[in-house]
Amino acid sequence: DIDILDKQIALEQAIIGSPLILGNKVTLLQDGASTYAAMFAAIRKARDHINLESYIIEDDEIGRQFADLLLERQRQGVQVNVIYDSVGAVNTPAAFFDRLRAGGIAVLEFNPLNPLAAKKEWLIYNRDHRKILLIDGSTAFIGGINISSVYSSGSATKRIKTTAVNTVAWRDTDLQIDGPVVAELQKLFMETWQKQHGPALAPKAYFPPLKAQGKDLVRAIGSTPDDPFSLIYLTLISAIGNAERQVELTNAYFVPDPQLLKSLIDAAGRGVDVRLILPSHSDSDVVFHAGRSHYAALLKGGVKIYERQGALLHSKTAV
């Protein structure tokens, strides 16, 4: 419905301010296996720079594959810049990142756990939960997939009885974006680097001229711990409020506040087909059971709830 789309676009523009950009090619990467394959291929093709921002970078098989490949590209003259979160990578030994630095890669720890190492006001809960890979300022990967072997399995997993998080495949989704909107994602990376007082970046073509690669319209929306409210959340609430036919959400850590709860129930009440795909188990028992405490109200309000079996759902998507 064009009227609904126009209304949503106008609301987003008023709330966010970032442009809606035409000329992009968006490719759905439906699981960790396809995401890593696409990322590795793009990294190998990099000619100028690689910017990686990830909440978690683990010292496991996948993490070491990334490290080896990034170091190889750095040796070939491609500047690699990496941001990782101090809490997300708390179990990753310092030697892992020291090896990257020794190879010439610029590495920035977001909001170090040690307050004495912080270069700005220190707040323990200020975390960088982004997962962004940027190649030559023209290709971007965004979504829920961290750098960790738990995402390595494909999307078709066998049903298993165990729910141990270290033995169950994690189900997640990424997008590959080629085209002009990548410059907006690059700005988000640069903004984080600057606000965290990272070392001076090597002079590279971080914002090259970008040509249209497809016909997809894309708006990049970023939120940070410094923001007074989440722009992403406001966009989601407004989209649900404008929905007339269907709302489909997947969420790994679904603990709706009163506003989101009301938005979903109100949508179902006006005849919208509201469907939630949520985890059947989680790496956070507290969050899992807190989310389930809202099931009765949602179901009573006409919202349909499904639980993902056979894998640990980590996706956060909305249609």
Region annotations inferred by a language model:
Residues 1-234, 238, 242, 266, ...:
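N-terminal localization/anchoring segments of enzymes in phospholipid and broader phosphate metabolism
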Residues 243, 252-275, 279-284:
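Helical hairpin unit composed of two closely spaced alpha helices linked by a short loop
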Residues 91, 251-254, 307:
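Residues at alpha-helix boundaries and short interhelical turns
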Residues 55, 85, 252-253, 287:
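Glycine- and other small-residue-rich loops at beta-strand/loop junctions that grip anionic moieties
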